[in-house]
Amino acid sequence: MNAAKHKKHADLARPSLGNFGRNEWAVLGTPCPAIKKLSEDIIAALSISYKCAYVDAAHVKEGQPAVLPGRLAAGAFAEYADKINHHEFVFNKKFNAFGFREVLQDADLILVNGNHQQAKSQVVVIDKVKEASLKRKLNQLTDVQLFLLTEGETTIFDFLKEAIPKWEKIPVFSLQEKDKIVDFFRNKMECAIPKINGLVLAGGKSLRFGSDKGMINWHGKVQREYVAELLQPFCKEVFISCREEQQAELNGNFQSVTDTFTDLGPYGAILSAFRKQPDAAWLVVACDLPLLDTNVLKFLVEHRNHSSIATTFQSPHDGLPEPLITIWEPKSYQMLLSFLSQGYSCPRKVLINSDATILQPPFPDALMNVNTQEEFQKAKALLGLETK
């Protein structure tokens, strides 16, 4: 056996997820009705901006048999009902973190009844009624971010001070200070908005056009580098998406993402970017948009809806979402993979069949792409360049 440690699995970048999603807090240390009420107050205040979810468990009296609802009692493993103003799924199967994260993939903020379930971060309520119960859950306090004092409580329990590093730096509010609690979560969510990376799609073979569209000089430099420079003011990092054989052509000014999902066109390029950095949002732009400018990108970023799976423009040509000038949020990664597993590799189909935010383009001509020599000549004329 080799001295080097054998690796059984690919070294994949994993998204920063908890048991249920990216941003989750377990509230524990007080009776369940108080946790439910607090969660309702937070959700009522923040649901206008964020998709919120609540996770709990039912209480069953000892010795009382579990009764399955509806058709589950007849042996069904699942039942779905369209409730007109909402949808209801009921399952008779075991769930673990993988299943929870799939069901709640759209959620931005998840509040968990920590008396029954665990979450990545915690809010600890100081309540004499649940002191003994809280002592038994010390191993669950892995990332305490807030203390809440119930009426009559004035200090943190001593056993918490011993168990939680730097406990004195954790904010402390009264459970009745609802505005402060809501502001705490609002600030946490604002800080959790994913950074934007830029991705220039330059890996196509340009079969219809006849030559590499990324190498056309529209603005004094090759188009793929021009677009990459346009993206820089709006992105933390900018990458050029390319095929393996194109790597040697890049001059080193920009990072690259080589397709690891091959033979899927732009769909594979987007997935390859998420595979590299799954917690980033990706501003994906095709390199065949010669009229694209800073104003269009600025409009897209300023109107970004980070709670959607993506923010895009409506195409002025066919009225459909334009997938190749789109901000794809991290939550879209799982959806893109899901569509692929069902036999679809069209990013536009994902946008059509999801909650994507679709904007009217401020300058419709900027979305004109060049796939043929006729479109090439039209673009040159619009740019005031010499035409043949």
Which residues does each predicted region cover?
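Extreme N-terminal, non-catalytic leader segments
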Residues: 1-26, 173-191
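Charged phosphate-binding loop/patch that engages nucleotide di/tri-phosphates or the phosphate backbone
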Residues: 162-195, 368-388
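Short acidic-hydrophobic, aromatic-tinged amphipathic segments that line or gate anion-handling sites
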Residues: 4-8, 78-82, 149-150, 166-178, ...
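Short, high-confidence coil segments that cap the C-terminus of an alpha-helix
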Residues: 22, 49-50, 76, 104-109, ...
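Nucleotide and nucleotide-moiety/phosphate-recognizing core
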Residues: 33-35, 45, 58, 193-344, ...
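N-terminal phosphate/diphosphate-binding loop that engages ATP/GTP or pyrophosphate donors
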Residues: 14-24, 36-93, 98, 103
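Phosphate/Mg2+-binding loops and adjacent switch elements
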Residues: 109-187
